[in-house]
Amino acid sequence: MKKNIEIVSLIFKSVDYLNLIYNELKSDKCKIEGWDVGVRIVANDATPEVLNRLKELDIPYTIYNDPKPNDYYLNRVYRCWNHAGVTSEYNNICFVNSDMVFSKDWLSNLLKHHDGINIPTSRLVESGKMRSGTHGVSFNCGRSPKQIDFELWEKYSEHIKKNETHSNGLYMPCVFEKSRFIDSGLYPEGNIYKDGIGTLHPHGVIQ
């Protein structure tokens, strides 16, 4: 396995969240010895304010404009993720959300379990505003970029971290090989239904 990976986040309309994920991606938390780690932000039908801010930041970015701008938003989101994966110039990809703050060694711990077969995902700690999904933890360190208590987060994440794996769970951050992502047919567009019931809620929790 070639030791290169690109961490990719989407951004839509929030300059605050853009600044948050920019600071996280540019931090030492997204560096790992022995790996070539790239970072990129994909502007997903982004607002002029977001695009102007991106131009000011020292980070690679690409602009995606959906061919069906009036389509259901989840369909557009997953088309953008597919675009992000297909256009990556790296052999391995890690998708993250723009509202995420990373813990120490999060990336190296994910890569320990990246075997080219399974898709490892990080355990999420969420604020508790909405019910968390499988293996998720509810603990409030702030519910917006301006409210985040980084010191509290660092202490709490260090306290609960474990080097173990479980089946299922939430869907990002996740690591996979680009070639396998393409060979799989990419993400389906929008929600997946079973017996008429959506399996993916709008906030991204697999039931």
Region spans (language model):
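Short, well-formed alpha-helical segments that are part of the catalytic scaffolds
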Residues: 14-29
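Acidic donor-binding segment of Leloir-type glycosyltransferases
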Residues: 25-69
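Glycine-rich, basic loop-to-helix element that forms the pyrophosphate-binding segment
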Residues: 67-88
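A recurrent flexible, glycine/aromatic-enriched loop bordering the glycosyltransferase active site
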Residues: 78, 153-178
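Short aromatic/hydrophobic "clamp" motif used to bind/position activated sugar donors
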Residues: 93
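Conserved donor-nucleotide/metal-binding helix-loop-beta segment in metal-dependent transferases, i.e.
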Residues: 105-121
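A short, conserved alpha-helix in the catalytic core of glycosyltransferases
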Residues: 110, 168-176, 180-185, 191-207
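Short beta-strand-to-loop element that shapes/binds the nucleotide-sugar donor at the catalytic cleft/hinge
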Residues: 120-140
